[in-house]
Amino acid sequence: MAQHFSLAACDVVGFDLDHTLCRYNLPESAPLIYNSFAQFLVKEKGYDKELLNVTPEDWDFCCKGLALDLEDGNFLKLANNGTVLRASHGTKMMTPEVLAEAYGKKEWKHFLSDTGMACRSGKYYFYDNYFDLPGALLCARVVDYLTKLNNGQKTFDFWKDIVAAIQHNYKMSAFKENCGIYFPEIKRDPGRYLHSCPESVKKWLRQLKNAGKILLLITSSHSDYCRLLCEYILGNDFTDLFDIVITNALKPGFFSHLPSQRPFRTLENDEEQEALPSLDKPGWYSQGNAVHLYELLKKMTGKPEPKVVYFGDSMHSDIFPARHYSNWETVLILEELRGDEGTRSQRPEESEPLEKKGKYEGPKAKPLNTSSKKWGSFFIDSVLGLENTEDSLVYTWSCKRISTYSTIAIPSIEAIAELPLDYKFTRFSSSNSKTAGYYPNPPLVLSSDETLISK
């Protein structure tokens, strides 16, 4: 494989929407998502009202890359070899002694090969994107509540209630029906929760188009919500930028399912219509599969093997399946790289103008892309040494997957928008260093020789 990657060499450029093309104002969107789910649990499922009270300190629990064991209510941070680096029961962190007794140096019981771990399971859930993270905090607090209520409850069955809360707020008809809390609030004040695309990104998209690239938008959001987001961040003429728009794509199934399992559907007034036996022309579609899409891309490019690159923020839904099943180039949007900037420049005493405050001004969430005091770095952690030996640093499982399945990782699309299209990025590969594919810089914890604070 070539050591470098260039957009100029790609025939097709595809994008995820949420947290990729559309960046959210995380200190506002995270409490909104949390509240959307918590209100449902309290009002519809009879959970304690205390779940609705969140302090700024509570948000430190949120860290991408955690696994929740749905049966025992434990959250786990995994090393690249599947051993447990840190763990909590609900929000309560385990001491090194309790951790050693519970997990030792063994592989976590559900740890499989990367392929197997990529799939959701009835036994665990991985938190790998910013839509999910507020749910991690909520689940942890539910475990705290149930443990206290039932005198040290050991096994749990709350997940079905979380799924019901997600369905209530995000189901296909929720946007149109103003159902739940999330969509009505985004509609009421999009500027509070969304960042408009910078002019540099809009210009870059047009530059790609003018260079003859086919542009795709593939999102699991439904068509009505997708339209609201794109009109806000890109303008009312956003459809001119994309040759093909695919909504309700149900990733990762879009990449992993057979065409017969997940056909494309046309849309009429945001309602899904009949299934299509194949994809014959550009346009706006719902659901679908990567196999039929690639057949159309062959026709559109006149090439037997058009080269596709896909930008996304979720390892589970975007990066792993696009690389593993479709063999596309993949660009991971990793806001944790922005967190490095934040540690240098953030001024917590700055507050928002009063006129920007609204219905959900509750305590601000810490920037979710900054390092958690409870969980440490997303990329690396220390393992306690045995007697008279030093602690050793290990890569996390999440960090390993970045270098395994991403072509490159960037903090945002804006970070590359002013580069020439033929710019040669150094890609992740087994022949390069572990940090080669991070642009513009690797995470501070991977590029410095500083010893991490021990657990």
Curated annotation (Swiss-Prot):
Protein name: 5'-nucleotidase domain-containing protein 1
Single Gene Ontology MF annotation: 5'-nucleotidase activity
Signal peptide range: none
UniProt lineage: Eukaryota, Metazoa, Chordata, Craniata, Vertebrata
InterPro entries listed in its UniProt record: HAD-like_sf, HAD-SF_hydro_IG_5-nucl, HAD_sf
UniProtKB keywords: Acetylation, Hydrolase, Magnesium, Metal-binding
Residues reported in the UniProt entry to bind Mg(2+): D16, D18, D313
Keyword Magnesium: yes
Family stated for the protein in its record: Belongs to the 5'(3')-deoxyribonucleotidase family.
Region named Disordered: 339-368
Record-linked Pfam families: 5_nucleotid
Residue ranges with Basic and acidic residues bias: 339-364
Active-site residues, record numbering mapped to chain: D16, D18
Modified residues (N6-acetyllysine): K171
UniProt-listed Enzyme Commission number(s): 3.1.3.-
Highest rank taxon of the organism: Eukaryota
Class of enzymatic activity (EC top level): hydrolase
